[in-house]
Amino acid sequence: HEGGILEQQMLDVVNEAGASLIGPNCIGLMNMNYHGVFTQPIPEFHPDGVDFISSSGGTALFIIESALTKGLRFSSVWSVGNSKQNGVEDILEYMDRNFDPVLDSKIKMLYIEQIKQPDKLLYHASSLIRKGCKIAAIKAGSTESGKRAASSHTGAIASSDSAVEALFRKAGIVRCFSREELTTVASIFTLKDVKGKNCAIVTHAGGPAVMLADALSKGRLNVPSLEGPIADELKSKLYPGAAVGNPIDIIGTGTPEHLATAIDFCENRFDNVDLMMVIFGSPGLVKLYDTYEVLHKKMEECKKPIFPILPSIVTAGPEVKSFVKKGHVNFSDEVTLGTALSRVINTPKPMSTDIQLYGVDVPEVRRIIDRLPGSGYLNPEEVRTLLRAANIPLVEEYASDDRDALLAFAKKVKYPVVAKVVGPVHKSDIGGVALNIRGEEHLLFEYERMMRLPGVTGIMVQPMLKGQELFLGAKYEDRFGHVVLCGLGGIFVEVLKDVSYGLAPLSYDETYSMIRSLRGYPIIKGTRGQKGIDEQQYADIIVRLSTLLRFASEIKEMDINPLVATDRGLFAVDARIRIEK
């Protein structure tokens, strides 16, 4: 309490003077002109170093330690502590508004404990990235909110962390989960831009190359096979026993000249290589100063980026230090690098925040929402009216407590049909769903059984659609807005939690990026002789849903589960919407 009063008094003095306050409860500010701090380490400062903003002072120091072991240099360090006047978002705004493309660093690292102003972070991060910057960030404290109980599939899957994930994707920020990963991603940013996903691994030791190839493949990058006359020619220039299939293993007795030859072939002769990763430690068979000099020259000459993995930081400490002193970074662990690189390459570019209005009747959406009497779950007819206003195709259905009317409808749409109870929200929990009803007697039996269940006011009948089940949902997060989720339905969403997140409103680019980042995407595309689904229509529905949400902030939770992809197109079969007014 006393500390809070002193903090407020300090802020009042600063505001009266028209000054800026960083902190309190922080290690302060360091840059090329000033590092009057009481902590260690103080890194080297260079104009082309990294700008680093941290919520925590202690963590900032540990991140600097991790960066220094890689040869990463700094341009400025900001520790915002309690953020009484300026938080991480405010420092980013300052950097964006005063950005000088010639003088300022283009690499930003963020360690964030709380996102108080998501809109500000989104706006200035994406603005800086569009100006040519690259941003990597850790958002700490990502699991606590996930423990909250929630009533829908969407609520159970979408924690506050999904909002962070969606925000970072929309802004184009590379999300990291540890100090080591953050400083590895920032080190990747210092190298030449990666133009593709095809990686060549050049090594003199088999094991690390295999582990690196595994890490790259898991991260959806390619380690293409190198074969044919060009590969044979390269093999003829190396010692017997060398392998060139990728990894290119020049073996333990390989010389600096062999390394140079392998790099030249990857740069000039192999068209299916976009970047090179060179693993070279100290087997004690060649002079490492000579080898690292070759690597230094090739990194300057080559147009394709080269990632140096020099693992012998103890045995070859002086040689590695000498290499780093020439302005290079070093990745001592190949798997950390492979994982970090996949994060960089799989992070989309900043997305448009324009709203796609096509196909959504916004006045009708508002009329429906404004007419609703209060908070809670909407009844099936209200849900259908709202989805119709957003032009989301619905399965034909009929709800009634009149047995004969239900039988007539089932006859019209043709068996098999599905019957569901009207009333309770969680129908399947009370046995209120019957699938694959093949005839009149079966439907009558289910009608009699279901009408006796507690809280049931009627029965809904739908044709039984055949096709791939998809899932679509949304959840409102304070300050962030609506997080939209998409994925394959059934086991994929419930057990495997294979979902993608986006922040409404969604552009088509962002929506396609969400769909294609799903682990189950090959099923959407069509795999093993099975026909794919209409990806364009799925994207249309997701975009329209995000527009609907943008104009109906009262919707706090919703899911369409399943959305069935049939030969005739996609249809929403079951949907739930909860509003708060």
Residue ranges and their predicted role:
Residues H1-K581:
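Catalytic-core regions of core metabolic enzymes
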